[in-house]
Amino acid sequence: EGEATLLPVLGSGIQLYVAWMLYFYTSVALRENVLVMNGSNIRAWWMQHHYISIVVGLLMLTMPVESDAFKHFGEGMLLFNIMQGLVMILQTYYQRRRLYTRIALGKSSKMDVASADSSAASGQMLLFPVLFLLQAYQLYMGLIMIVYHAGALASPEGWLDEFPQSSDLRSSRTVFFCGVFFIVLGLGNFFSTLATLNAK
């Protein structure tokens, strides 16, 4: 009969992860809006980043897990999220080290944010190249998604009429738009990181 596969389980796992990321970015966007209203100085890009990420999450949740486009997109997305997780661990390590140093110097308390001064630290020499590498991969992934799925966008089939359930047009179009958003996110992250680096 049919071959046993982990794809439905893996695809469902990815969709659960995307649902969690959707919740995460929604809660962060709400929190940052409150912080801005209370006078925090948060770069406008990061607020926009979270709203764009919410849109990407919603798009990803609409894709059927058994489609070829989802399989193609899911592999790259998993690798990107693993890399993103490693960068978050590095950022946390860096921030904790900075805060520990500032507490030891008597410049901060445990509840302060570690980036209060503009002096560069040695941990940035590792953090920034890894961030740039992640952003380059995000741009590459967005470009690949656009190139491989642009044909589905150009196809007149299925825009105003019904198309067969076996067709992968809807998923391919979704992946195309996710690719566009990935490029926007990658470029925004890159320029925001450069602005932060120049400010230090």
Task: Identify the role of each PLM range.
Residues 1-200:
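Eukaryotic polytopic
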